[in-house]
């Protein structure tokens, strides 16, 4: 029986390109974990959610399906998906605590915040399960994760634009997400070239559209964040800077 491809298995043999893919997997695993911990910290500190409802609920739905319902198809992550599920659960708890501060101007949603988050999470979980049933859990793991990543990157941009300020956001949250995304994409390309984990989805034009779009969102985010921060500079400091110019 062929030994599963793991960090230990690869590094027991001669160093090769697949060893690099394992290192990138570790980078992505740590990076996403830092991203989630950073969201908990920033949301609690600023008393406002650090992530939108759609990306958060989609992430939890995907993680639940592949951590508990189809664990064999996330086994190459060696339990990391379960860790992410618990970290995201912590993000959800903090988000529910501080969401009233963000939805104060929407009375109907304000009164039903808990129900809304639970309902949307169940819907995304059902959708992830349906996708796995439709195209198989192996591809469903990748495409369901692609949706999570698209919503996470686009949601960060949308959150800045809709709020008009940087509360609830930080360079750390962005950097951890961006480096994890980039490392994950390179890992998938390496594994695709070596036919590991059965990743035929990189042959899809839609997949490359998704990759380019997500990377573009993550590349644009720090510039938008920096622009927002300039507008948040206290008036006296801003006027002093203008006079110096």
Curated annotation (Swiss-Prot):
Its EC number is 4.2.3.-. The chain crosses the membrane at residues 17-37, 51-71, 76-96, 113-133, 138-158, 170-190, 206-226. The keyword rRNA-binding does not apply. It comes from Penicillium brasilianum. GO terms for biological process: terpenoid biosynthetic process. The lineage of its organism: Eukaryota, Fungi, Dikarya, Ascomycota, Pezizomycotina. This is Terpene cyclase ausL. Pfam families: Pyr4-TMTC (PF25129). The keyword Transmembrane applies.
């Amino acid at each position: 029986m062929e030994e599963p491809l793991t960090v230990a298995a690869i590094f027991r043999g001669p160093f090769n390109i697949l060893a690099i893919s394992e290192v990138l997997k570790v980078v992505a695993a740590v990076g996403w974990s830092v991203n989630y911990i950073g969201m908990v910290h920033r949301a609690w500190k600023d008393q406002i959610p650090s992530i939108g409802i759609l990306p958060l609920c989609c992430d939890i739905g995907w993680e639940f399906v592949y951590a508990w319902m189809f664990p064999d198809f996330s086994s190459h992550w060696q339990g990391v998906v379960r860790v992410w599920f618990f970290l995201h659960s912590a993000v959800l708890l903090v988000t529910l605590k501080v969401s009233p501060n963000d939805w104060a101007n929407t009375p109907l949603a304000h009164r039903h915040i808990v129900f809304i988050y639970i309902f949307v999470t169940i819907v995304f979980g059902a959708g992830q399960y349906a996708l796995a049933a439709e195209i198989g859990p192996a591809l469903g793991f990748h495409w369901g994760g692609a949706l999570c990543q698209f919503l996470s990157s686009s949601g960060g941009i949308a959150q800045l634009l809709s709020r008009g300020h940087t509360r609830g956001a930080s360079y750390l949250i962005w950097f951890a997400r961006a480096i994890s995304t980039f490392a994950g994409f390179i890992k998938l390309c390496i594994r695709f070239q070596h036919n590991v984990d059965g990743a035929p989805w990189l042959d899809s034009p839609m997949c490359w559209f998704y990759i380019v779009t997500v990377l573009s969102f993550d590349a644009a985010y720090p510039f938008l964040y920096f622009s927002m921060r300039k507008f948040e500079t206290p008036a006296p400091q801003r006027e002093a800077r203008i006079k110096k110019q």
